[in-house]
Regions:
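C-terminal regulatory/oligomerization modules of transcriptional regulators
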Residues: 2, 76-99
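A short, Lys/Arg-enriched interface patch at domain edges and termini
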Residues: 54-86
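Short, Lys/Arg-enriched charge-dense amphipathic segments
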Residues: 15-18, 63-68, 89-99
Length: 99
């Protein structure tokens, strides 16, 4: 079975059980902008596999001693780093380095 990592499949209770993070903390992560679960038409949160991975990242950073503001900065820097790597790869494909 091929699970699309962006497909919102999991309720908050399932996400909490799978990740070991209680539902209230998941709501706090959302309030702080660290997590953006999809919403059904009725407003129910639904989490994708990718979001479950992000919850794991957040939990690991918190366990390492960072506070939520520090976690936010690390996640922003990681996203920026990924974007820069993609841009570098694109430029390398566009014009190979002359040796």
């Amino acid at each position: 079975m091929d699970l699309n990592t962006d497909r919102a499949l999991f309720s908050i209770s399932v996400a909490a059980e799978v990740t070991g993070v209680n539902p209230q903390m998941l709501r706090i992560y959302e309030q702080k902008g660290l997590l953006e679960p999809h919403r059904t038409e009725g407003g129910t949160r639904r989490y994708s596999t990718r979001e479950l991975e992000r919850i794991g990242e957040i939990a690991s950073l918190l366990a390492a001693g960072l506070n939520l503001a520090g976690v936010e900065q690390v996640l922003l820097l990681r996203a920026e780093n990924l974007e820069l790597r993609r841009e570098i790869d694109h430029l390398r494909r566009k014009k190979p380095l002359v040796t």
